[in-house]
A protein has these predicted regions:
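Conserved helicase NTPase catalytic core signature
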Residues: 51-215
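C-terminal, active-site-flanking charged/polar segments
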Residues: 231-234, 238-250, 453, 457, ...
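Active-site metal-binding core of divalent-cation-utilizing nuclease and nuclease-like domains
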Residues: 525-558
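Catalytic glutamate of the conserved HExxH
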Residues: 223
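Basic, glycine-rich
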Residues: 586-652
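Conserved helicase motor core of SF1/SF2 NTP-dependent helicases
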Residues: 189-192, 202-218, 226-521, 538
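Short beta-strand-loop-alpha-helix junction that forms the active-site gateway
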Residues: 547-580, 598-602
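Charged C-terminal transducer/switch regions of large nucleotide-driven machines
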Residues: 1-86
């Protein structure tokens, strides 16, 4: 047996010796001198043997020679093994970046200073192009009268047409031709002089003659949700092309006394397209008949996301792009009326509170425009009358009321007449309530009970740019709605609840923890320099990568850091990426700092020094606006009243 074992060992040793450089005698000497020692050491390290074998397998499985070399260097170095994964990833990223730079040399030219200059040049060129476009349009439509159709200028003046007719009418002092005659016999010359006309459907029907459809190259119907198909037909028939613009979630055509029995009684009823009869607006009909359709998603009006958050979720399926404000606040203030009394369409205590708030707004925010909206015309008239009385002793109120049809005027309107208007601050009177304090609340809410009630509310909730002052006699839990309640009543109750809570579930302003390595790096460096940052600041479909809080006012953001990652690259057009987004943020009060990953990759320490220096400069220069909200809520500004306690119109 010993002889067999020796023979087997000799055979295996010979096989091993054949793989080792040198003569067999050398191997035999090595075996004789060191074999026992090697075997002893292996036995002592047997617990690490399996790990060593696994390591050799992993080294052999590395796909690239450079990666295997790096692994061997790490094994031979004194670097802590806990750092090996980061060092390995860093080496892989560095090698791949080098390969990418070799393949695309322009990447090596991207530096922050150059990119900033390019973006400024691009923005300026874009602005110049828009100015040139406007100038080109003005030049194109500025026609000399001699270049327009001259028409008939001989014979009887009653037979004059085109420019001859216009010139003849322009020198008259009396006995002018009716406008319809002018449009009929001088239409071509008028379109030559003034190619763009703005008219209502009623004006088109009453003044313009019948057309063959070639009067205008293009007709644009705005606020199309409020126009019925029959009113739009005469407008559309006069143009070669039509663009219909409107919001299907806003006011439908409104005629409180409209009846649709005429079509039903018609002898031709069977030939009428039933879809037309069922459409409530030209917008609804056009969205089915015309293609393509485009949905505009960027929301500009609200300077605070809380003003549009409710509508975005309930009416627009959270599809709007809402840019965040640079101040963390809820911009809707609720004023609950004490002892409300709603009788015959008017809530007098609510009228009084609305007027008090209007006066306080004028005192606290004289720079802001102001509008008042009530749920019905009776309430709006009552508010307007009381404000008119108060204006007798309040000069600024009188000045605002006298600015009729001006963008700075103070308007008081019922809900039905407010679409298309906007003001910095909107005071809303919800009007409805119990007939006596503590009494039952009947579920009679006027037009809100109709199928389109929620659309009316959407108009109401989206008129403000800066703030909403909600004056109400109701709490959301007082509206015990039946299972059959329509969308208008449900939206009304939910909005009251939204204002009471100060958030709307997923649509409230969000922040998150840093997730990407870049965010973690910048977040940590900012913290070590004494600044606090929030990641992913925003409301809906647009989020700022990192927003740095003002150290002296934590509710204000000092700076928005915008990177060049997925958020930047999500924009399809350079205009969006490099101009419009930043323009919108700056209009909302943000200071925007653009971060370029190439610079941060090469020199993170230098980039953080530049960023911190910018933050310190802004901290000294940025003026924090005074918060006057608490004064408004507390009523610290006294509403002026007549000195003798009576109304200026009171005969006593």
């Amino acid at each position: 047996q010993e002889a067999e074992a020796a023979a087997a060992f000799t055979e295996k040793a010979a096989a091993v010796a054949s793989r080792i450089p040198g003569s067999p005698s050398t191997f035999n000497n090595v075996c004789a001198d060191h074999l026992y020692k090697w075997l002893s050491e292996i036995c002592e390290l047997s617990e690490f043997l399996s790990s060593w074998i696994r390591l050799q397998d992993l080294l052999a499985s590395l796909p690239a020679k450079a990666e295997r070399q790096l692994a061997h260097q790490l094994l031979e170095s004194a670097v802590d093994g806990a750092l090996w994964p980061d060092l390995y990833r860093w080496n892989v990223v560095r090698s791949r970046l080098s390969a990418l730079t070799l393949a695309q040399p322009q990447l090596s030219l991207i530096r922050a200073s150059d990119q900033v200059a390019r973006r400024k040049r691009f923005a300026k060129t874009e602005d110049d192009l828009r100015r040139l476009d406007r100038a080109e349009v003005i030049a194109a439509i500025h026609n000399d009268p001699d270049d327009c159709q001259q028409g008939i200028s001989d014979g009887l003046k009653a037979d004059f047409t085109e420019m001859a007719l216009i010139r003849n009418e322009s020198v008259k002092r009396i006995k002018h031709r009716p406008l319809r005659h002018l449009f009929q016999y001088a239409g071509s010359a008028l379109r030559g002089l003034k190619p763009c006309w703005m008219m209502s459907p009623a004006t088109v029907a009453s003044l313009l003659p019948r057309s063959k459809g070639e009067d205008f190259d293009l007709v644009v119907i705005d606020e199309a949700s409020q126009m019925s198909p029959e009113r739009a037909l005469g407008v559309i028939s006069r143009a070669k092309q039509c663009v219909v613009v409107g919001d299907p979630q806003q006011l439908p055509p409104t005629s409180l006394f409209q009846r649709n029995t005429a079509w039903e009684d018609s002898d031709d009823a069977d030939e009428i397209d039933i879809d037309v009869l069922e459409e409530e607006s030209i917008l609804d009909l056009s969205s089915k008949a015309f293609q393509p359709t485009r949905r505009l998603k960027w929301h500009y009006r609200s300077r605070n996301g809380s003003l549009i958050a409710f509508s975005n979720k309930h009416f627009y399926d959270s599809q709007l792009v809402v840019f965040p404000a640079c101040r963390r606040e809820f911009a809707i203030t609720r004023h609950l009326v004490e002892e409300p009394r709603y009788k015959k369409g008017v809530n007098e205590p609510e009228v009084r509170d609305v007027c008090d708030i209007v006066i306080r707004q004028l005192e606290l925010y004289p720079e802001r425009t102001l509008g008042v909206v009530a749920m019905n015309e009776a309430q709006a008239d009552a508010i307007a009358e009381q404000l008119d009385d108060l204006a007798f002793h309040h000069d600024e109120l009188r000045r605002r009321l006298d600015l009729r049809d001006n963008s700075e005027s103070l308007f008081v309107k019922p809900l039905e007449k407010v679409q298309g208007d906007e003001r910095d601050t909107i005071v809303i009177s919800t009007t409805y309530g119990p007939s006596e304090p503590g009494g039952a609340i009947p579920l009679r809410f006027g037009l809100l009970n109709r199928a389109s009630g929620h659309r009316r509310l959407n108009v109401l909730f989206t008129r403000a740019k800066h703030a909403i002052e909600l004056v109400t006699s109701l709490k959301s839990n007082q509206l015990r709605l039946p299972a059959t309640a329509g969308p208008g009543l449900l939206a009304f109750r939910d909005y009251l609840r939204y204002v009471e809570k100060g958030s709307v579930d997923s649509e409230s302003a969000t922040v998150r923890e840093p997730t990407t390595p870049f965010e973690k790096l910048v977040f940590g460096l900012l913290s070590s320099n004494g600044f606090t940052a929030d990641c992913g600041v925003g409301f809906s479909n647009y989020f700022i990568d990192l927003a740095v809080r003002h150290p002296d006012a934590p509710d204000h953001y000092l700076l928005a850091l915008e990177g060049d990652g997925s958020n930047y690259n999500s924009a399809r057009a350079a205009r969006d990426r490099d101009k419009y987004r930043q323009s919108v943020l700056e209009a909302l009060g943000w200071n925007v700092y653009k971060v370029w990953s190439t610079d941060w990759f090469d020199n993170p320490e230098g980039e953080i020094k530049k960023l911190v220096a910018q933050l310190k400069r802004l901290r000294k220069s940025v003026v924090i606006p005074c918060d006057r909200t608490e004064d408004l809520r507390a009523g610290n500004v006294i509403s002026p009243r007549p000195r003798d306690g009576t109304s200026p119109r009171d005969p006593t």
